[in-house]
Amino acid sequence: MLSGMRPTGSLHLGNYYGALKNWTELQYQYDCYFFVADYHALTTGYEDVSHIEDHTHQMVIDWLAAGLNPAVATLFVQSRVPEHAELHLLLSMITPLGWLERVPSYKDQQEQLKEKDLATYGFLGYPLLQSADILLYRPMGVPVGEDQVAHVEITREIARRFNFVFGREPDFEAKAERAIKNLGSKNAAIYRGLRRSYQEQGDAAALTRAHALLDGNSRLTLADHERLLGYLEGTGRTILPEPDALLTATPKVTGLDGRKMSKSYGNTIGLREDPDEVAKKLRTMQTDPARVRRTDPGDPEKCPVWDLHKLYSAPDVQAWAANGCRTAGIGCLECKKPLIDRVVEEITGMRQRAQEYEDNPEQVRGIIAEGCEKARGVASETLDDVKQAMGLTYR
């Protein structure tokens, strides 16, 4: 299992409930590798690198304070495992440009970050670097939310293409071409067109149609049927296994202004923020606009505070808050009181655990060094297999 985060600043409750909390559970179920994606931080923040070292160090402290256990999970820094960059380079030789341009987040981030110069190869190629990050450890799965499934899918396509190009049996292509002729001239032409659409454009509908074409053809032997499926999908000897996207429940973490909690919106509560500041932020957090006066009833579903109640409050407290809101039986500040207590309690625990590591920076560096060494051991084995398949081993 593998996942990572970009070190772009202090972590907040959105990061914790969106990923970290899930990681703390997964580490006891799988062999997990969690990395600080400092190369990825450069794709949108290369103009100022003055804080990247400190952000990386502080991110690892946040992880440890949140409950990641270096005794069971491997924590490391991406740039300290050079195999990431080398596999990225090698995979770039076989990745069609169009595959990178059609990743949904490519255009989305260009729109969202118009003030930044994103006309760089690094930004265009970050999904490929992400694929290299994943494939290097040959994980069975990658924990993601719904919005990240496309990133895992392009990783699967790249692995499939690599296995197709470099993992085929001797004379695989010649045997596949002979099998295509056995389809008959009309079906052979259709198959070639569908194969081209899928491999060059990632057309999933073409893949489905090609499967149906092969399944419905009685001229093929079983061996040729399987061979043409491999020729179509780009499979062969599996050097880089295709990882699954493991959809994980990621609860909505609402920011102080009612939007998704995000550093870019300036609406966050930091994992190690001062408790008094946290309480102040929550007391002034937006509520249901219908509650102008204390006696005005409201609707919890229209109140950003309610989303946090669902994360933090026990069922009886949620029922009290919802009923009090709808009937105007309680005011907004009264509603926030038990929530503030719970959030401050959690933040205080994070701060205390983090302080132990702040006071022992050498311990943190040791955890990182040990994790990097272990990660390199696994990564180098994969890279050796990749280079051997590509003919890049020399005496």
Residue ranges and their predicted role:
Residues L2, P7-A132, E153, E157-A159, ...:
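N-terminal Rossmann-like or analogous alpha/beta NTP/dinucleotide-binding catalytic cores
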Residues L13, A150, R156-R395:
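Conserved nucleotide- and phosphate/pyrophosphate-binding catalytic cores
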Residues A73-L75, R138, P243-A245:
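A short coil-to-beta-strand element that immediately follows conserved catalytic motifs
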Residues L97-E101, L136-P143, S313-A321, R351:
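Short helix-capping/linker segments at secondary-structure and domain boundaries
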Residues Q109-K116, R138-V149, N267-I269:
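Flexible, glycine/proline-enriched loop segments at strand-loop-helix junctions
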Residues L129-Q130, L136-Y137, N163:
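Membrane-embedded alpha-helical core segments of multi-pass
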Residues D133, D147, G258:
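Active-site glycine-centered loops adjacent to acidic/histidine catalytic or metal-binding residues
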